[in-house]
A protein has these predicted regions:
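C-terminal "lid/loop" region of Rossmann-like NAD(P)-dependent oxidoreductases
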Residues: 142-152
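Contiguous beta-strand/loop segments that form the cofactor/metal-binding neighborhood of enzyme cores
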Residues: 51-125, 155-170
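Soluble or luminal CAZymes and related metallo-dependent hydrolases
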Residues: 46, 155, 177
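C-terminal helix-rich "cap/oligomerization" subdomain common to oxidoreductases
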Residues: 161-188
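Short loop/turn hinge sites at secondary-structure boundaries
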Residues: 10, 132-134, 165-170
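Short polybasic amphipathic segments
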Residues: 107, 124-140
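Predominantly a Rossmann-like dinucleotide-binding segment in NAD(P)-dependent oxidoreductases
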Residues: 1-74
């Protein structure tokens, strides 16, 4: 949410590129699953979440989608992949892995006036969100760390409350983003 506000308010200027890495160590669990170790593997498993983030932050105009790497280190389906694409002239690279022995999430968004950096998720230990203001013509940027904390995973509780609220309102969903994500995967 903090990153979305920074992007909307153009705090880091014109966005040049974004790099996201998301990895966990579930390759052996996936290998034991008949339905998970099939098809595009980690690309549709973890990749769907990364594409959803890109939709939220940058929009849906996906162009020039290319798989840079697709590896089957321990599984029958890909357990590591790197994909690059563009949204609104922003170069985006996403990397996903089931062979990362400590759960890891990193995101770097680089713009003309600075950059924004996310490191980890609170459920996996200390995390932070950092904003760097570009120094011209060059030099060490002015840094501001917004959040640095470690919590138990709050997402399940929040998702459960959100789901109950939707049920009370009799709202049964919108598949628009799911269809966009599905069309992304059909292009690779």
């Amino acid at each position: 949410n903090d990153l979305k506000k920074i992007l909307v308010n153009k705090k880091i200027g014109k966005i040049y590129h974004c790099k996201i890495f998301y990895g966990n160590g579930t390759s052996r669990l996936v290998k034991k699953s008949k339905w998970r170790d099939k098809g595009k593997g980690v690309i549709t498993d973890i990749g769907s979440h990364l594409i959803d983030l890109c939709l939220y932050w940058f929009g849906k105009d996906f162009k020039n989608i290319n798989i840079i790497a697709s590896n089957k280190f321990e599984n029958n389906s890909p357990d590591h992949a790197i994909i690059k694409f563009n949204i609104k002239n922003i170069f985006i690279e996403i990397e996903m892995s089931l062979c990362m022995w400590k759960n890891t999430f990193r995101c770097d968004v680089i713009g003309s006036k600075g950059s924004a950096h996310l490191n980890s998720l609170c459920k996996w230990g200390k995390n932070f969100f950092e904003l760097r203001e570009r120094k011209l013509p060059s030099g060490q940027p002015k840094r501001k760390v917004f959040k640095k904390y470690s919590l138990k995973d709050p997402t399940w509780k929040l998702e459960n409350l959100y789901l109950k609220k939707l049920i009370k309102k009799r709202y049964f969903g919108n598949l628009k983003n799911d269809l966009i994500i599905n069309s992304f995967f059909k292009k690779i």
